[in-house]
Amino acid sequence: MNTENIDENLKNDENSIPNINELEITNSNDRNTFEQKCLYPALKLIYSGIMGSSNQPIIVGSTALYLQGIYYDKFPNDIDVCILNKSDIFKYTIAFGRMCKKYGFNVDFITYDTQNTDETSYTKININDITILAAFKERCIDFLQSFRDFYIEKNNSKRAQKYAEKLIYLQEHYPELFNVSDE
């Protein structure tokens, strides 16, 4: 498999950094719609036992930043959030992790970055996006499509579309990545 092309499609740029203030929903009807279409499916994914190498439920990248940034009170304290990002691109990661810890969450950072050796909250694991995406398999597709469609509708959000289509691209072109044993 040619992973170079995959990596190119998975790259994020500065414009894709999530801005929590931009994403906040203030209209109660919009909030209810979001909870039905996006938040509850995400919680269902967590409770269904999608586990990471540290035996933690996983929410990936900007979805984790978004959901946790607005709805941290919806997550019970015994649920851990494992954020998988390129920390040199997502400048929110460290501050976001500290916020999670403040509200009682255990946070692992799995990252490409090996230069921030003074940041004690990092877990130094060499992992790539393919491994991350394969761990989600097709169970993540419906959630990402809902996430994308909702924000295209409400905010014309290219960020949401770009994020969701990373996974959709891989599912269409490399379906073998999603045939991962549950064992």
Task: List where the protein language model places each region.
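Helical scaffold of the NTase/Pol beta-like nucleotidyltransferase catalytic core
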Residues: 2-59
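Catalytic cores of NTP-dependent nucleotidyl/adenyl transfer enzymes across multiple folds
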Residues: 7, 13, 17-29, 116-183
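Metal-dependent nucleotidyltransferase catalytic core
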Residues: 29-43, 82-120
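Active-site nucleotide-donor binding segment shared across nucleotidyl transfer reactions
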Residues: 44-79, 84-89
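N-terminal cationic-hydrophobic initiation segments that often serve targeting/anchoring roles
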Residues: 47-51, 97-100, 171
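Residues that form or immediately flank small-molecule/cofactor binding pockets and catalytic motifs
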Residues: 62-64, 112-114, 137-139
